[in-house]
Design a protein with these regions (language model features):
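Nucleic-acid nuclease catalytic cores
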Residues: 119, 130-161
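Extended alpha-helical interface modules used as scaffolds for assembling large macromolecular complexes
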Residues: 1-130, 157-163
Length: 163
């Protein structure tokens, strides 16, 4: 029974990383929603924009899910780049591979109507703060840098991607 739990956990890691690397956002969203509904409490993720607690929780979750890619990516968290600090960047060890830049946002119901607007806020922050600067300086072609906006509201999650 314990081995089955670990095997199922490995399946989640593998499914998540495969969806990420193949740019299957619908699958990525489904996996995160499944994790949220089956494994998390509102105590974990918060139901309001309480300081940075929900954002930090999801940040740690995503780091945990992608850590298995260390043999293919240099995974960096909270590094300064451009005019700010991105949440997570994945620098490919082979320059011809895709890079990923992730920004996490908690839905602010006073400023945003829905999670779609929260994702757009994440994309605006990536652009305005020029978070791609460090990746480009590292020699990664900007056309290979995929930006992911993550929006959270309690157990609700939305992830979108753009180049």
């Amino acid at each position: 029974e314990i081995l089955a739990m670990f095997e199922n956990g490995n399946a989640v890691y593998n499914d998540f990383t495969k969806a990420l690397l193949s740019h299957r956002m619908e699958d990525l969203n489904d996996i995160l929603l499944d994790i949220a509904y089956t494994s998390m409490s509102y105590f974990d993720v918060g139901n309001e924009k309480e300081a940075r607690t929900p954002e930090n929780f999801y940040h740690g979750l995503i780091l945990g899910l992608i850590v298995t890619l260390r043999d293919r990516y240099r995974i960096v968290s909270n590094r300064e780049s451009g005019r700010g600090r991105y949440d997570i960047a994945m620098y490919p060890l082979e320059k011809n591979q895709d890079a990923f830049l992730m920004e996490f946002k908690v839905w602010d119901k006073k400023k945003e109507k829905n999670l779609e607007e929260t994702v757009e806020s994440a994309f605006r922050q990536i652009e305005e703060k020029k978070y791609v600067t460090d990746l480009v300086t590292a020699g990664i072609n900007e056309e290979r840098i995929y930006k992911l906006g993550f929006a959270f509201a309690g157990k609700e999650v939305l992830v979108k991607e753009k180049i």
